[in-house]
Amino acid sequence: LVKELMKDRMFYEQSGGGVTLSGGEVMAMSTDYILQIAKALKKEEISLTIDTCGYVSYDKFEAILPYVDTFLYDVKVMDPELHKKYIGVDNKLILDNLVKLSDAGARIYIRIPTIKEVNGNVQNMEDTIHFLKKHGIHPAQVNLLPYHNTGSSKYPKLGMEYKGTDLHAPEKEEMESFVKLFQDAGYTNTKIGG
């Protein structure tokens, strides 16, 4: 994989970009495999970003932390019961890992996939802000990601039922009000999208 990634080195250098590992939960893969990729990219001075939901043992983060430039870290629902209802697991491990990564000095982009019927409300946004402040977490950016159903057409092709038909993105004005909540709380690097 690293040899394949190196073929695009010219694009990384010209754009100032790098490699983002995402899709599924990258951190759930073999730590040795991720570490091998991360070390090789670091050696070649190519930036590495990891997209994660944070639901893995912290020792996996600890192993790759020296080789990762940025973490795109999903924070979906602050209420543990709602998180379990919609995501299937409690959010304690996810939030604990976020605190540990922040304490370790990691560069973090908080990403909040925002669904009107689930977490697209003032209470969840205020709870998120409170958590960040309480733990001294200062993300490089906060991205509020409006819900979309772009991948819904793939489900029937895979013989699966798409269950997100009753879900919607908050209205533009609501999204803008959430951005303002974060900005007013000192997170001036908050934006819609990312």
Residue ranges and their predicted role:
Residues L1:
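Aromatic/basic-lined ligand-recognition segments
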Residues M6-P156:
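Conserved AdoMet/S-adenosylmethionine-binding subsite of the radical SAM
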Residues G164-E174:
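Short, flexible active-site recognition loops that position polar ligands and cofactors
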Residues P156-T165:
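Short glycine/proline- and charge-enriched loop/turn segments
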Residues K172-G194:
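A cross-taxonomic marker for long C-terminal extensions/tails that follow the last structured domain
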